[in-house]
Amino acid sequence: VLLRGEVGETYNIGGNNEWNNLDIVHLLCDQMDARFAADPSLAQRFPDAPGSSGRSARDLIKFVEDRAGHDWRYAIDASRIMGELGYKPHETFETGLRRTLDWYLSNEDWWRPLLPA
């Protein structure tokens, strides 16, 4: 976009995939469960997490009444940036979410102070 995009134009950057919100939550929970299964030290660092007691992170999901105008899914059409500028994503949604989760698990000192007391 910086080198080939036109000034004043808008480009959606994405992977041309669509997920509903609940599927994203399930994916995140499943990835968290896999981390706890693979790394026993996480149970010591996060003793209140479901994975610490052998439960699934999905146990934390609570269904509530939707707010008016609730978006049940989000989609980005990146065809313009792909066609005009040759953009191609380097990550799938799944690998990007996995890398994000791994970053948070590796950088507890950054996010822990942000939690409410």
Label every PLM stretch briefly.
Residues 1-117:
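C-terminal substrate-binding subdomain of Rossmann-fold SDR/epimerase-dehydratase oxidoreductases
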